[in-house]
């Protein structure tokens, strides 16, 4: 049955990519959790979607130009709702340790945010952190940048990956460069992808928030969906599991 991935945690009800959002994702029973990783000025892995802190904190500036200490001084919760004042941008290590502490045993999708900025050492640092211990959850890496995924597979040939795309052009480009494992298409390309995916590879579709789109993915028995509302998706999925 279709797996439910909490997109940036429970992004629809909690400030995205924060520990509060990931706690909620685990609490509601998400099958998977998706997050985004950038590198700070001092080479630390931080979990945030945008290249800048402007949208989701009370600060300004590009991640690559800020130190971890500067980023940790920011409020990453108040923009969403004042209840979450004081939430911080977490490091990737903090999220991994939290998920382990909470007993999460699903899949963690780490999106490598190299489609706009090429972070030197990002892949190596993620794999090194992953290798520090045995985690109770599976890890899959995804990226819109196929070159990043090629680099990752050279460093760890057995690591599971997924190719993100939102255009036919990049789907074909990435597919030609990579071993065929899984596709992560934009919802708007679902019909095209279903025809194009002649090898019947697993599809993890983003971002699926409307009931009608969730129901269609369940009916098609899509491998997984990324949603901002995992609790709602899990409730809808129950109708297909009876």
PLM feature spans:
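Phosphate-group recognition and catalysis centered on beta-loop-alpha active-site segments
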Residues: 1-242
